[in-house]
Amino acid sequence: MKAKAISHIAVFVRDLDKSLEFYRDILAMTVTMDAIQDTTGGSRSQTYKHRRATRRVVHLGWAESEVPYLVRPCHPGDQPDGEPIKLDQVGVSHYSFTVDDLPSLAEELAAKGVNIPGGINAFKNSQGELSSFYVLDPDGILVQFDRGDGV
């Protein structure tokens, strides 16, 4: 098999409105879909841990980009199981966005109160350069920003 591309990345959240404040309002992603979906049919009984009747799903992306989009599902009024994982645990530990100006973005996010674990200086190398840094979203999920050069 040869896949054409990654279609989307779905990350379950506890509070979709708080998640939207971060991804839409702070990171300037665009909401391309916001819907309540029926989860009672099809393969849902095999792909869900608990029975749920509906879910709210939001698709987020950047209008000018053709890269994969994020899907943010949640079940309003129903708390999900589990905790976010760290980089050395099994599962999807983080996702990363390539940006042009890391130092400016780091300053902007810090000014908006976004949690940068250890502070931005923790991510600088011995020459004081910044090739990437992580933040925590409202659910404690690691989100990385990098230069796109694989360093």
Q: What kind of region is each of these model predictions?
A:
Residues F12-V67:
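Core segments of cupin and vicinal oxygen chelate
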Residues S65-P68, G77-P80, L102:
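Short, charged/polar surface micro-motifs in flexible loops or helix N-caps
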Residues H8, V90-H94:
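Eukaryotic phosphotyrosine signaling hubs
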Residues P73-D78, G148:
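Acetyl-CoA-dependent GNAT
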Residues A5:
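Beta-rich catalytic cores
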Residues K2, V11, D34, F97-V151:
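Vicinal oxygen chelate
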Residues A53-T54, G91, E129:
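Exposed loop/turn and edge beta-strand positions of beta-sandwich/beta-sheet ligand-binding modules
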Residues T40-R44, D81, N125:
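A cross-kingdom feature marking solvent-exposed beta-strand/loop segments within repeated
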